[in-house]
Amino acid sequence: MAAPGRPSPLAERLRGAWQHRGALALALWPLSLLYGVLTALRRALYRTGLLRSERLPVPVIVVGNVIAGGAGKTPVTLAVVRHLQARGWRPGVISRGYGRATVDCREVLPASSAAEVGDEPLLIARASGAPVFVARRRAQAGRALLAAHPATNILVCDDGLQHLALARDLEVCVFNDEGAGNGWMLPAGPLREPWPRAVDLVLHAGSSPGGGAPQFALSRELATHAVNASGHQLPLEQLQGEPSHALAAIARPHDFFAMLHARGIQPESEEALPDHYDFSSWKRPPDKRLRLICTEKDAVKLWPAHPDALAVPLALRIPPAFFDALDARLASLSSSGH
């Protein structure tokens, strides 16, 4: 069994293989060739018009990635939405709503449950106040959002670089600190599609992944406070030395635990759970002394049953030059008549 707070040995081995062109990656390389052929064929079908992309009547920004696993797309989406709001835009957000139990197209309301709409869309809706819709087909979500909120004049798609059925005007590609890995496609490498490929802007947490698009380095750290379900904030320094249980149901839970350690918090136990984990069957540690510490994404699922759980927000540092470049591209869209 993997140590608490660490990925499973299999996950660690595969993640390691994705960073190097070693024996395991080489063994999987023939499957990557097949995956690459299928990906190229699908793109060709859209490029030739045999499959059609639906264009919505407002500009569409897609924030996504080309690597498997967590790249930090949702915090970037939230940052983009807040920037657009500050610039006078009226943005809406569309998403597939990964991890939800429903399959229909629906609006994400602050009172929605994560089981109905997905944890990331619910977090975005509560944190931004922007209208959010989820659907398997993003274009359907966009149409429904614009019908319900006709004042919306721009859409941000959380994830969806590979969802070619939705036409887009601007693509933001996000990389974590592992970049493009060994440069191979799944399953021999982390890439969902070949890289480099044409995108408008790149945000990267590690070294530059290469490619011709303008690139901007971002950094992540935890905020200096935690918050409970009622909105009460607690300085993190007050949790130093306190008995606690940290948990994270995100793509890279060890990153969250490491950031807690960097803030001087050493939980007595750490629990790594699968991304989009359903907490309905989760059992709280029996030790009543332990304070629950979690991510914002997990809090939207934990708070209904555990309102005392302390969510630690992620502080994302994106250089102003990125937003300047974003604004410039949006201005060019406006001048071209979109």
From Swiss-Prot:
Q: Where does ATP bind?
A: I67, A68, G69, G70, A71, G72, K73, T74
Q: Which InterPro entries match?
A: LpxK, P-loop_NTPase
GO MF annotation list = ATP binding; tetraacyldisaccharide 4'-kinase activity
For biological process, the GO terms are:
lipid A biosynthetic process; lipopolysaccharide core region biosynthetic process
Which terms in the GO cellular component ontology are assigned? plasma membrane
Q: In which pathway does it act?
A: Glycolipid biosynthesis; lipid IV(A) biosynthesis; lipid IV(A) from (3R)-3-hydroxytetradecanoyl-[acyl-carrier-protein] and UDP-N-acetyl-alpha-D-glucosamine: step 6/6
Keywords recorded for this protein, A-Z? ATP-binding, Kinase, Lipid A biosynthesis, Lipid biosynthesis, Lipid metabolism, Nucleotide-binding, Transferase
Q: Which reaction does it catalyse?
A: a lipid A disaccharide + ATP = a lipid IVA + ADP + H(+)
Keyword set includes Thylakoid: no
Q: Which domain of life is it from?
A: Bacteria
- Keyword Coiled coil listed: no
Class of enzymatic activity (EC top level): transferase
Q: Which cysteines are joined by disulfide bonds?
A: none
Pfam families membership: LpxK
UniProt-listed Enzyme Commission number(s): 2.7.1.130
Per the entry, what this protein does is: Transfers the gamma-phosphate of ATP to the 4'-position of a tetraacyldisaccharide 1-phosphate intermediate (termed DS-1-P) to form tetraacyldisaccharide 1,4'-bis-phosphate (lipid IVA).
> What does the sequence similarity comment in the record state about its family?
Belongs to the LpxK family.
List the protein's name. Answer: Tetraacyldisaccharide 4'-kinase
What species is given as this protein's source? Answer: Acidovorax ebreus (strain TPSY)
Q: Which lineage ranks, top first, belong to the organism behind this chain?
A: Bacteria, Pseudomonadati, Pseudomonadota, Betaproteobacteria, Burkholderiales
